[in-house]
Amino acid sequence: MTQYYFLSSFLPTQLPESVPLFSISDLDDLLYLNLSENDLCNYGLLKRFFDFENFAFFWAGKPIPFSFGEVTQENVERMLSSQQWSDDNDFEDFFKDFLMNHKSSQDRLNHFSDLFREFLSYHQTNSSKFLRDYFRFQQQLRVVLAGFRARVLNMDVSYVLRDEDSSDPVVLEVLMQKDSPNYELPEEFSDLQGVLDDYGLLPHTLNRALALYQFHKLEGFCSDSYFDGNVILARCATYMFAIRNSLASVEKGREIINHIEKAIKW
């Protein structure tokens, strides 16, 4: 029996800069005992999101720095060879198409942002409310950061965003600022303006500031939910942020922000 009330009451609030309240193995054990099969699938998808950049590390020939158990140093090569997340869970069609169209590791690395965009888009249509909202936020955040980066590097933003959905209000608003003297963020991201103004040219500091920004935004994704799977997933995401932040070195911080800023095809 799913025990939403128990879990919602038991899982404490995680502070962003505090020691992680759970290890991923402890969190797995707790949730496997108390969540339904469907909720566990959504939990696995959340971990898959946090692990997705590990494919980029593998294709770059670098060791995977950390995993939440979905994409690990031990299983990544087998997963790509079999095109399966697990024995009973094949890769999505967009992932299979990507592997077929991009054969070499370098080509896959060069187009990794396309793959990640497809992942976020695809799972906005077939997952829980929290994941739909969270993945949409992540996709739009990457557009906003790409627009900012294009402005800093004096690049043509319409070229940078050429493969994005121009009917998306956030994409459209960023594109409309092509010739504007100042880069004004879309209203949904107005609270990010100060972060970019203060830290936009300091990669590692910006990484930490963006991590905090994303952490605090999690609270809004389940503000209208009580004692259900969406609350549990949002709380789990805060634990994962804390775990990753506790392990991030300066070098890792630069790697992360580089992936975030470049998560649009150039």
UniProtKB/Swiss-Prot annotation:
Domain of life: Bacteria
UniProt cross-references to Pfam families, sorted A to Z: DUF2764
Consequence of changing R132Q: In strain: CWL029 and TW-183
Similarity comment text for this entry: Belongs to the chlamydial CPn_0087/CT_309/TC_0583 family.
Protein name in the entry: Uncharacterized protein CPn_0087/CP_0687/CPj0087/CpB0087
